[in-house]
Amino acid sequence: MLVLVTLIFSFSANIAYADSESDCTGSEPVDAFQAFSEGKEAYVLVRSTDPKARDCLKGEPAGEKQDNTLPVMMTFKNGTDWASTDWTFTLDGAKVTATLGNLTQNREVVYDSQSHHCHVDKVEKEVPDYEMWMLDAGGLEVEVECCRQKLEELASGRNQMYPHLKDC
């Protein structure tokens, strides 16, 4: 009897694992505008390999998309004070060029969950950083877990910051 119960449990666990693996099929093809919920939702940075990640960083559309550009207000905590900056995101498929005055950051959405509740970005620099963004309103637990798994895979053991746990 114990062998039968163990066998059934093992089989059930394997099916659950297989289902969770197939649930992690991201949105294809990856499109940054889709990943940003077509500019209708705010996203918070929940994990990052960048040791200088801003505390409580949130990106929120600050207007309508014009051609391939989207104005985005980035809000963050600077010590105990809140600060905001107005960026322009230029979107090209999965690629995003974020511009603030003379500062430019290039990134690519490398994973986007099916319902766009979370996504993982690769920040292009000599040693790329990876970031996990989630809807400010929250997301489907299974999709958030898929984003977390994708970030773990890409970050391959690098230290991660949790900027949204900083008294936001």
From Swiss-Prot:
(12R)-hydroxy-(9Z)-octadecenoate binds at residues 54, 85, 107, 119, 121. Keywords: Complement system impairing toxin, Disulfide bond, Pharmaceutical, Secreted, Signal, Toxin. It is found in: Secreted. The keyword NAD does not apply. InterPro entries: Calycin. Residues 1-18 form the signal peptide. Expressed in salivary glands. One of its GO terms (cellular component) is extracellular region. One of its GO terms (molecular function) is toxin activity. (9Z)-hexadecenoate binds at residues 54, 85, 87. The keyword RNA-binding does not apply. Belongs to the calycin family. Lipocalin subfamily. Bifunctional protein derived from blood-feeding ticks that specifically prevents complement-mediated C5 activation and acts as a scavenger for inflammatory modulators such as leukotriene B4 (LTB4). C5 and LTB4 binding activities are independent. Inhibits classical and alternative pathways of complement activation by preventing the cleavage of complement C5 by both classical and alternative C5 convertases. Inhibits complement in all species tested (rabbit, rat, guinea pig, mouse, pig, and human). This is Complement inhibitor.
